[in-house]
Amino acid sequence: MRRAIFPGSFDPLTNGHLDVIKRSLPLFDEIIIAVLNNPDKKPMFSVEERCAMIREILPTLKNGNCTLIVDSFSGLTAEFAKAKGATAIVRGIRAVSDYEYELRMALMNRKLEPTIETVFLMAAEEYSYVSSDLMKQVFRLGGRVDGLVPELVEAKMHEKLGK
């Protein structure tokens, strides 16, 4: 079985994340959407809320023969991948700055777990500037994020911030 993890904070999940998931589907038999619990950050949504939103959104994808699983973790991505029996870590790249960061992370992950490969997918042009942090910032300042995050996520952002 070709199993991969797609790790991230997903705070919140964006259409850029969904694009990477969709484009990963033909490459793997199973993809674990691995929601990072980082106690050093103050997220908009709890890990449980993020996992619940992702679980609600994933059935809208046409995933063919690929099974999609949502799980959460804390600690080292490479260790989580190994524990789940994954052979690959999927990462989206939006710009050169992402590549520089992701290359360092991929090399460290390879050092920690040499049997796990990192697969980079270039962001679709229409999402090349979209990040969770930018979506939160724009939303908090009263800007529109429709078309950049799933409708469910936008509704939950309105609920969370009372806007």
Set out the residue ranges of the language-model regions:
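Nucleotidyltransferase catalytic core that binds NTPs
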Residues: 1-163
